[in-house]
From Swiss-Prot:
Keywords of this entry: ATP-binding, Chloroplast, Nucleotide-binding, Plastid
PANTHER family (UniProt xref): YCF46 PROTEIN
Localization of this protein: Plastid, Chloroplast
Coiled-coil zones: none
Chain positions recorded as ATP binding sites: G266, I267, Q268, G269, T270, G271, K272, S273
GO cellular component terms attached to this protein's record: chloroplast
Protein name: Uncharacterized AAA domain-containing protein ycf46
Flavoprotein as UniProt keyword: no
Organism listed in the record: Trieres chinensis
Protein family (similarity comment): Belongs to the AAA ATPase family. Highly divergent.
InterPro entries with a match to the protein in the record: AAA+_ATPase (IPR003593), AAA_domain_protein (IPR052381), ATPase_AAA_core (IPR003959), P-loop_NTPase (IPR027417)
GO molecular function: ATP binding; ATP hydrolysis activity
Length: 497
């Protein structure tokens, strides 16, 4: 249901208090004044802490710096006066005992009258005692058709001519920005360059990165990793290849559902994070990384608010890749943060969104320890598929050595003995293989010569792989994966030593 329709429905049903969660205060007020007033013919009273009531000559400036007095005016107005009361940032006062008590008293009156309080704010926290009284509406960032309308208006007002393909690219680049931000950035572009062209897209993307960083929990990653940079995992590569065009119109017309995502479980250093980056590159989609530590940081109630903000931004930027690294630490069964209630609520919200989402946000989650993952996460249907990434076998290690040495020495990579290197690197992960090459390079650089196979062999003998240091955990994970509960990323058999 569209926001306008849902809000009108709540107003007709005489819901007493509605909270609109948004960062676009002006856009919400514009919609209310244009659409809601036309449909319901209600007087609109607008209040904020600094200016008090505005837009109504009889009460101009009333209740300045006094939120309790703002509620008293609502009580005093005659019952025959159909009205909407827009209380901006009023959510900041809800924890005050006098405000919460007054809201409870006022809500009983509002149920019998054509009056409604609409709280507009961006900090979504409602005290428990008011949750039954307040109905929450999420006002999302502008969608594609709204952005298209705004860009068309701007282009026409400036008498500009823009190629259709550039216009489409501009529309995509604006996704995830508020209308106010879009207007501001485009005004800056026109003031600087006197036109809108291909260079405008990079400026918009830079603005988008700044916006995403301001969420505090999402990071926009610029990536150039490719599937060819990952050795082995042929089953996983084949699965991803078949879904490369899953977000296209052709796939939708064919009847294919939008893919939900992928959970990668495995030993550290086996390429789980690298896979997330490679998917974004191969599918040519933006990559957003969730900062799990900040998700659960801050004061009580912020985690749920931040998760909803993350979902809103990701869906607005869709199609995109949402990368959740080390999910086992985020939603651990052995939660050490001391607030299992918060963790459970965040987990429930995330799982609900993952199961029901319709926007093309492809989630790539990684985990090292399956024992820490709640059963709700690994249950069938949450993700499209769950893959296990094991330590590379002999042939896969040869491939990994070739990939990394070719990166460092594109002209002389054929001079190395890959069979010997693969034989000496049993139990090494892909990340540890790369590290052995770097160690060999440091050794040779110190002696002012080129590094060789022997240098890498020496580095391998000096490095102790994590799989040996944590042998019992590695064997346990391999045993779990070999039991058939999970799909193997590689067609090579798991060998449990």
């Amino acid at each position: 249901m569209k926001f306008n329709d849902e809000l009108i429905l709540l107003l007709k049903a005489r819901y007493p208090i509605i909270y609109i969660n948004t960062i676009e205060e002006d856009r919400v007020e514009y919609i209310i004044r244009k659409h809601i007033k036309a449909n319901l013919n209600r007087s609109i009273y607008s209040w904020d802490f600094v200016d008090g009531y505005t837009n109504n000559p009889n009460n101009e400036g009333f209740a300045k710096r006094n939120p309790l007095q703002a509620l008293e005016l609502i009580e005093r107005l005659t019952s025959e006066t159909p009205a909407l009361f827009l209380l901006k940032d009023f959510n900041r006062f809800l924890t005050d005992i006098s405000i919460s008590r007054k809201l409870k008293n006022v809500s009983r009156i509002l149920k019998l009258q054509p009056k409604t309080i609409i709280i507009i704010g961006s900090d979504f926290q409602i005290p428990k005692e008011l949750q039954d009284l307040i109905t929450v509406l999420q006002f999302n960032l502008p969608v594609e058709n709204e952005i298209t309308q705004e860009l068309t208006r701007l282009v026409n007002s400036l008498n500009l001519t823009i190629d259709p393909s550039l216009f489409e690219s501009l529309t995509r680049a604006c996704q995830g920005l508020s209308l106010e931000r879009i207007r501001r950035v485009l005004s800056k572009i026109i003031a600087t360059h006197k036109t809108i062209d291909e260079n405008s897209i990079s400026i918009l993307l830079s603005e988008k990165k700044q916006i995403i960083s301001q969420t505090e929990i999402l990071e926009y990653w610029s990536v150039n990793e490719k599937m060819g940079n990952i050795g082995g995992v042929d089953n996983l590569k084949d699965w991803l290849k078949k879904r490369k065009t899953s977000f296209t119109i052709q796939a939708s017309n064919y009847g294919l559902p939008t893919p939900r995502g992928l959970l990668l479980i495995g030993i550290q250093g086996t390429g789980k994070s690298l896979t997330a980056k490679a998917i974004a590159t191969e599918w040519q989609l933006p990559l957003l990384k969730l900062d799990v530590g900040r998700l659960f940081g801050g004061i009580v109630g912020e985690s749920e608010s931040r998760l909803r903000q993350m979902i809103d931004v990701a869906e607005t930027l869709s199609p995109c890749i949402l990368w959740i690294d080390e999910m086992d630490k985020a939603f651990s069964n052995n939660d050490s943060r001391g607030d299992s209630g918060t963790s459970n609520r965040v987990l429930a919200t995330f799982i609900s969104w993952l199961s029901e989402k319709t926007k093309p946000v492809f989630v790539v989650a990684t985990a090292n320890n399956v024992d820490l993952l709640p059963l709700e996460i690994i249950r069938k249907g949450r993700f499209d598929e769950i893959f296990f990434l094991d330590l590379p076998e002999l042939e896969e290690r040869k491939e990994i050595f070739k990939i990394h040495i070719q990166e460092f020495r594109p002209n002389s990579w054929k001079l190395f003995d890959y069979k010997k290197l693969a034989q000496l690197s049993e139990s090494f992960s892909g990340a540890e293989i790369r590290q052995s090459i770097i160690e060999a390079m440091y050794q040779a650089f110190d002696q002012q010569r080129e590094f060789t196979t022997d240098d890498i062999c020496l580095a391998l003998k000096q490095l102790i792989p994590l799989a040996q240091l944590e042998n019992s955990q590695t064997l346990k994970l391999q045993s779990w994966a070999s039991s058939g509960r999970i799909r193997l990323a590689s067609s090579k058999r798991i060998s449990i030593n």
